[in-house]
Amino acid sequence: MGVAERKNREREARERRITAAARQIAEAEGWSAVTVRRLADEIEYTQPVLYSHFKNRDAIVGAVALEGFREIKKVLQRAAQGPTDSRQAREGVAIAYLDFAREHPALYEAMFTMSTDLQFAKAGTPSELREAFEVLAAVVPPSCRDVDVATETFWAALHGLAQLESSGRIKHSTRLARAALLVHGLFE
C-alpha cells in the first residue's frame, strides 16, 4: 500500500503543478497562451505526461474551474455569514460574487465561459459546482415559489453584471447600487 499511496500523491502533485501553471499563465497572458506544449515546457514535463493526467486542454481548464468553484464557495459563504439581516446577506453575496469575478478574471473565465468537460445542472455535476450553487440558494428567500429557478435567475443576473463590468460596458463605481437593486427587484 505504501508504494501505491506514494504514486497517487505524486500524481496528485503533478496535476496540481499543471493546473497551477495553467492558471498562472492565464492570469498573466490570457487563456489563449495556455497550450499543452507551453504547460509542458513550464513544468518541465513532456506533453505525453500531461496527457496522462488530462485528456486535453479543456480538461485542464475544467480542473482550474473546479478550483475556482471551491474558492468562490468560500468567498460567498463568508459574505453570507456576516450580516444578520437576510437582505444584507443577499447583497453581500451579490457584491462578493462581482468582486470575485473582477479580482480573478482568468479563473472566472475558466469557470463560466471557457470550453470544459464540466456538466452543469445535470446528474453528473461535480460537487464543487453544486456546493457553490447551494451557497447562492441559501440566501434566496424560502418564500420564493421555486428556489432553484430564483437561484438560477440570481446567478444569471450576477453573471451578466460581471461580464458587462469586465468588458467595460457598465461602470464599476455603481456596482453597490446595482447589487441592491438586483436583490430588491428579485426578492422583495
Predicted regions and their residues:
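Amphipathic C-terminal alpha-helical segment
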Residues: A156-S173, L186-E188
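Basic, helix-initiating cap at the start of DNA-binding domains
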Residues: M1-E29, V36-R38, E42, A59-G62
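Alpha-helical DNA-contacting segments of helix-turn-helix folds
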Residues: A26, V61-G68, M111-S115, G124, ...
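Short hydrophobic clusters on alpha-helical segments that form packing/core surfaces
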Residues: I18-A26, G68, I72, Y97, ...
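Amphipathic alpha-helical packing segments from all-alpha helical-bundle domains
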Residues: L118-C144, D148-T153, A177-F187
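Short hydrophobic/aromatic patch on the recognition helix
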Residues: E44-F54
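Hydrophobic alpha-helical connector segments
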Residues: A63, Q77-A106, L129-A132, A150, ...
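Amphipathic alpha-helical segments used for helix-helix packing
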Residues: R102-F120, Q163-R169
